[in-house]
């Protein structure tokens, strides 16, 4: 997990959950833009992804492993005592929505980009 702080007066903190088989490095531009616009950013590589150590990339034993990571990042974000938002992309969006089904999160809002969802008619 990494933290990037804005050099401006902070408006809030954004916790980012990336897509499947991605890593933090792919979000350099997003992180830069958020910081430039007054937001701290907290993000890490999800278990089995990026620079995490797994024999088989993308493999986890339990989906709750993702929840534990996101909850820890949100806890750290809330230490700033300013509004916390979560941003989920693809798998990250699915993780956040699944987590919201199970528990109330201490956040001000969510942003979802192409969350992995199936909509039933």
Outline where the language-model segments fall.
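Structural signature of beta-strand start/N-cap positions in the alpha/beta core
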Residues: 13, 40, 83-85, 109
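Short beta-strand element of the alpha/beta-hydrolase
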Residues: 11-19
